[in-house]
């Protein structure tokens, strides 16, 4: 809720309630090797969690399901360490504005924050606001042996690793895009989920029966449409940047991707899709008006809520279909970062480590929040009573395996989203894909020349 601010100091022990979750087989998700940048010493050293007893940490969080869950266990951290946690939870846009103001002023008032790496990664790195964590991860007097950095999924580690190989944050949450589809309608026809873009289009055409049912939907609204666009772009072999960090838009892959994206929405989406954000797409899907929808996997909770959704229990979840250039899923990663201006850097790191530990990742997944650790998906508790459909867990894991950054790693991500977003809107409205890509290329190259020096 925009404008809402929550401040807190944890004061009493929180108890974990066992959640009923889905039965799913253990599937290995390739983690990233620590490599030479974060190596493990031969001798084990016990972490002294009480070394900063009496310290008060100031934390900033953007509103997020992961945050809602981890806050419940703050008293546990305080008991473990003897530290106190002061924290603020505010909407992401306002939170980032506050963070930028304080970082620019150099106040040092924030010790750690829950970073949106897909927006902040390069900008904050170039500004020197991330405290590099490589040495902390290497130091066994600071990092518990069972923390298991190699348990983090490859896409999550890539999201927090900078071009100079410094690690800027510890991953908390990874949101891949997946395919939502009307399983009941597919079952009636003996279909499984589409495996290729061509199959997806064929099924959209077969199911499209307006105004009662539309075959397909994705975001059409400018800026918002930049996130699903990544999937189509990668599927056709497109890249954001050339090796020398110039615009890579002026290629046939971008034009082909735009032809597919705009064409699918013109032919098979509900009227007015050019102004659809995730909310409008989700609403149409939940009302039973759309057969297939591509967006972030964590929208599933509302689809399965009978109080909100007419299609609860009728939704299938699948990894995105492969395209001509390969199989990809855009991912968006959040992570706990230590401020380079903090006066309590090591203490703040202990909090970030605790928050992203196996124990807390397990708690998050049991609460229905996707996590960056591979091992968590094999929890025995997940094999108990299902909280979500089997296909949700499988789609999530399959998507983590093929995850790829959903936005370009540049300083001004927001401006890029506006540039490509307007181009997509114009193409949906009927402009020639080659023309809108040519104009977007000029604008994007100008942006890079101004901001990437």
Tell me what each language-model feature is.
Residues 50-54, 134-152, 236-256, 305-310, ...:
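Short, solvent-exposed loop/beta-turn-alpha elements that line the ligand-binding surface or hinge
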Residues 1-20, 24-34:
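N-terminal secretory signal peptides
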Residues 45-46, 53-56, 150, 315-318, ...:
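Long, aromatic- and glycine/proline-rich binding clefts that accommodate carbohydrate-like moieties
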Residues 204-210, 244-274, 320:
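Glycine-centered hinge/linker elements that transmit conformational signals in sensory
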Residues 76-152, 184, 188-195, 291-292, ...:
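Extracytoplasmic "Venus flytrap"/periplasmic binding protein-like
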Residues 73, 120-122, 227-231, 235, ...:
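Extracytoplasmic/periplasmic substrate-binding proteins
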Residues 45-51, 117-176, 228, 312-318, ...:
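Hinge/lid segment of periplasmic solute-binding proteins
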Residues 157-172, 177, 199-247, 290:
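Extracytoplasmic/periplasmic solute-binding protein
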């Amino acid at each position: 809720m925009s404008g809402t601010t929550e401040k807190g100091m944890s004061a009493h022990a929180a108890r974990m309630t066992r959640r009923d979750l889905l039965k799913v087989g253990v599937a290995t998700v390739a983690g990233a090797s620590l490599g030479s940048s974060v190596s493990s010493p031969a001798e084990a050293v016990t972490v002294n969690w009480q070394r900063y007893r009496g310290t008060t940490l100031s934390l900033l969080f953007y509103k997020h399901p992961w945050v809602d869950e981890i806050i419940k266990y703050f008293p546990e951290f305080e008991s473990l360490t003897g530290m106190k946690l002061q924290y603020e939870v505010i909407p992401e846009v306002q939170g980032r504005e506050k963070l930028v103001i304080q970082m620019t002023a150099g106040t040092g008032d924030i010790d750690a924050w829950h970073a949106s790496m897909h927006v902040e990664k390069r900008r904050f790195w170039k500004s020197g606001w991330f405290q590099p964590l490589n040495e902390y991860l290497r130091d066994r007097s600071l990092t518990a042996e069972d923390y298991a950095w190699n348990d983090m999924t490859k896409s999550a580690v890539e999201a927090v690793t900078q071009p100079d190989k410094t690690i800027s944050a510890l991953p908390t949450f990874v949101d891949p895009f997946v395919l939502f589809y009307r399983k009941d309608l597919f079952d009636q026809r003996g279909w499984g989920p589409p495996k290729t873009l061509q199959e997806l289009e064929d099924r959209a055409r077969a199911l499209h029966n307006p105004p009662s049912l539309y075959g397909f939907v994705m975001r059409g609204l400018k800026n918002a449409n930049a996130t699903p666009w990544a999937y189509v772009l990668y599927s056709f072999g497109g890249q954001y940047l050339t090796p020398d960090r110039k615009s890579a838009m002026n290629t046939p892959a971008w034009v082909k991707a735009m032809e597919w994206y705009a064409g699918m929405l013109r032919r098979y989406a509900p009227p007015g899709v050019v102004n659809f954000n995730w909310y409008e797409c989700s609403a149409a899907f939940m009302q039973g008006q759309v057969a297939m929808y591509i967006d972030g996997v964590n929208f599933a909770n509302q689809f399965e809520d009978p109080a909100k959704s007419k299609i609860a229990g009728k939704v299938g979840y699948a990894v995105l279909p492969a395209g001509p250039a390969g199989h990809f899923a855009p991912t968006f990663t959040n992570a706990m970062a230590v401020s380079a201006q903090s006066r309590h850097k090591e203490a703040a790191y202990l909090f970030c480590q605790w928050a992203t530990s196996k124990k807390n990742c397990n708690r998050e997944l049991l609460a229905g929040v996707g996590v960056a650790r591979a091992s968590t998906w094999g929890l025995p508790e997940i094999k108990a009573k299902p909280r979500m459909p089997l296909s949700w867990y499988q789609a999530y894991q399959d998507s983590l395996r093929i995850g790829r950054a959903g936005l370009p790693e540049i300083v001004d991500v927001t401006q890029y989203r506006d540039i490509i977003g307007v181009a997509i809107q114009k193409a949906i409205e009927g402009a020639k894909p080659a023309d809108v890509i040519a104009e977007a290329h000029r604008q994007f190259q100008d942006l890079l020349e101004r901001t990437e020096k």
